[in-house]
């Protein structure tokens, strides 16, 4: 492997990592906003939406921090974080699908899950 090839791979890795962190940030923002719009004393389905939205926002925020900061996690630890984020995002998207007006947040969740999948695929 030449130096330029390894540098190109490093640049691509960093770009993919940043894209995943950015998708996590967008999802966290969308879910936090959607959760804040739900009546905390609402029906059981509203409470489920609020809890899933808050959980998704927190997991996405934590994942973004892992990806954007100098982390002491090894590759296996990063993979576990990404898989957890992907799972939580997909669960949240399913709940959001049942609520009119939550389409943008559901889309952000799915995009984040896909970004996590894509980045996992770059890990060895």
Outline where the language-model segments fall.
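Amphipathic alpha-helical hairpins
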Residues: 1-124
């Amino acid at each position: 492997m030449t130096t330029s090839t390894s540098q190109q791979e490093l640049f691509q890795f960093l770009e993919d990592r940043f894209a995943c962190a950015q998708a996590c940030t967008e999802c966290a923002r969308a879910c936090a906003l959607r959760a804040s719009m739900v009546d905390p004393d609402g029906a059981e389905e509203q409470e489920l939406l609020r809890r899933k939205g808050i959980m998704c926002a927190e997991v996405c925020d934590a994942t973004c921090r892992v990806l954007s900061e100098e982390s002491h996690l090894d590759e296996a630890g990063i993979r576990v974080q990404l898989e957890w984020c992907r799972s939580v995002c997909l669960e949240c998207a399913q709940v959001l699908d049942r609520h009119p007006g939550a389409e943008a947040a559901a889309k952000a969740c799915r995009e984040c899950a896909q970004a996590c999948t894509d980045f996992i695929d770059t890990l060895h």
